[in-house]
């Protein structure tokens, strides 16, 4: 009752304003902060949601599919408030509960929870357009301001990669059927080789996700073609 606004239709825009969803995201972010992980706040949720939506929009998917990707993107990390381990599955089950309460159609619930449940590289893979867009958006959100550890000497490998990423962009070229991740790395902090060693699994996951969308995943670091 009290957890939901009186809305005729729940949309991505309205979900961003629901206190319950935001409480789970922010608690997950706090937990990960204590454990020494990078930022997983509402800022990350919005970036992933909007990037996932943009990818599908550029590829000509209908508004409904774009909206499903945005909703999955916003809710994909809620399960971090339960535990980092298997957080994709926890997030999917939490989203399932909320979407049922909000009277979402079964097909939409299935698409959203499937995408959320598949987004972690340890346990998942892209299976359709919504999950592919979510994976590409999430795994390419590499940026300096996601690092929360103030002491460079104490950086773990993920801190080092994110801190080294001075700028990054993800571009879809519909004509060439390419999705390109461009990263500007400060190589004094992290070499291109280090980046690949740390994120190889993620990049392979992006390659598979791009293929599901009929695209080739390509990457440039400091202007050099990597893959």
Description of each model-found segment:
Residues 86-96, 106:
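Post-HEXXH active-site segment of zinc metalloproteases
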Residues 69, 73, 90, 116, ...:
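Short alpha-helical catalytic segment bearing the HExxH-like zincin motif
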Residues 1-87, 98:
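Acidic/His-rich, divalent-metal-binding segments that scaffold phosphate/diphosphate chemistry
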Residues 11, 105-168:
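Histidine/acidic-rich helix-loop-helix segments that form or flank divalent-metal centers
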Residues 37-40, 125, 198:
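Non-transmembrane, amphipathic alpha-helical segments
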Residues 59, 102-106:
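Inter-helical turn/loop segments and adjacent helix faces that build the functional surface
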Residues 141-227:
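Terminal helices and disordered tails flanking the catalytic cores of nucleotide-processing hydrolases
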